Regions:
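Conserved beta-strand scaffold positions in the cores of enzyme catalytic domains, especially
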Residues: 106, 126-128
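Active-site environment of divalent metal-dependent phosphoester hydrolases
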Residues: 12-16, 35-39, 56-62, 85-90, ...
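Conserved small/polar residues in nucleotide/adenosyl-binding loops
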Residues: 139-145
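N-terminal active-site segment of His-dependent metallophosphoesterases
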Residues: 1-49, 57-75, 80, 140
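Non-DNA-binding regulatory cores of transcription-related proteins
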Residues: 93, 97-100
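Acidic (E/D-rich), amphipathic helical modules within compact regulatory domains
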Residues: 52
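Proline-aspartate-enriched helix->loop->beta-strand connector
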Residues: 102-104
Length: 149
């Protein structure tokens, strides 16, 4: 089983509770609006980190992250982006990526609202972990060792 910590919208602040959970995770996914490269440094010290940049992120952060990430974790394809739009309509960039890549899980941020929803039209589990800055919200995701197709 893979334990994944999903966070977004830290805006330059990383709570000690988030770092505690990050240490226990096999992977940390940050869905953008990192706010300060120090957040990436702190998370990278304690766990395997994958992150995308958000709309507030500096050139420095954008130089070491991408707008989108596609991860394969235990046979699950995970699409990570910052701004996705409202399911099942999405913005054009995300909708085109979903149609091309067929992810199982979409992790996104931006709204600061923790939300987990199943997009039945595109067969995608959509997860917005909320804002891990102030106040703190986050999501844990545990994937089985191997996906059975």
């Amino acid at each position: 089983m893979k334990k994944i910590l999903l966070i977004s919208d830290t805006h330059g602040y990383i709570d000690s509770m988030i770092l505690k959970y990050a240490k226990k995770a096999d992977l940390v996914i940050h869905a953008g609006d990192i706010g300060d490269v120090k957040v990436l440094d702190e998370l990278s010290k304690v766990s395997n980190l994958r992150a995308v940049y958000g709309n507030i992120d500096s050139t420095e952060i954008r130089s070491c992250t991408n707008e989108n990430e596609f991860l394969n974790v235990e046979g699950f394809k995970i699409f990570v982006t910052h701004i996705a739009g409202k399911q099942p309509y999405y913005n054009n960039r995300v909708r085109n990526s979903i149609k091309k890549e067929y992810p199982d899980i979409l992790v996104y941020g931006h709204s600061h609202i923790l939300k987990i929803d199943n997009d039945k039209k595109h067969n995608v589990l959509c997860i917005n972990p909320g804002a891990a800055g102030r106040p703190v919200s986050y999501t844990h995701l545990t994937l089985p060792t191997k996906r059975i197709v």
